[in-house]
Amino acid sequence: FVGDKYQSIYQFRGGVNAMDVIPHQSFPLSCSFRYGQEIADLATKILQKADPKIKITGLGYDTKIVKGSEYNDDCPMLFISHSNVTLLDTLIEAYHAQVPTVLMSGKAGLYLDKLNSMIEFKEHGTPTYKPHQKYKDYKRLVFSERDSESTTFAKMIDENIDNAKELRQALSWSLSVVPEKAELTLVTAHMSKGLEYDTVMLSDDFFAAIASFKNGKPLDEPELNLPKSAKSLFLQVGDG
């Protein structure tokens, strides 16, 4: 019987975590052939927040961990953030720098449709995204559409519409990038599980999530998974 009590499937309504229900003697897996000891040590530090007994051994490629500010290579990179907000901010920066960038989720087109519609609704009262056309006004849309991207876009539009328009341009530009030729691929931690990339950068927005343990706030289980970097893991941290 093999199981993983941290799998998201157990969070579905009515889902039962078999690892907590069935009496068993547990033998946790403690070795990984996907990365070396440096990443294994980092994984251990993070996972011990959930279970102090965890100890990971890296038996794979001798992976290196360095500060993001020291990155000077030009190989394709996977950028992983804790939140969608950081991901979209990074897309805008990449657009300004003209670094070919794509969203791993494949949702750039959907995001563009929603964002453009919300901007047009706010400024001209003419939503362009069909599901938005049922609302009488922009405020009603914002009140009713509570998915994460709509909430993010509404906040951006209301706080700084010029920034929202920059994101609109960045999303449109990203759609023209061929994924195989992208130098930067953006993904959230939740969607990165199972991916393998030679070069990975972790955003600095993970530190707030990990620090939340000190205040007794649980970190979402899916975020406890580290990327399967084969060669290099870059941490986006400040010098302090």
Q: What is each residue range found by the language model?
A:
Residues 113-116, 121:
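Accessory recognition modules or surfaces
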Residues 99:
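Short phosphate-binding/catalytic loops that engage adenosine nucleotides
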Residues 1-67, 74, 78-96, 104-113, ...:
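Conserved helicase motor core of SF1/SF2 NTP-dependent helicases
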Residues 120-240:
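Conserved helicase C-terminal RecA-like lobe
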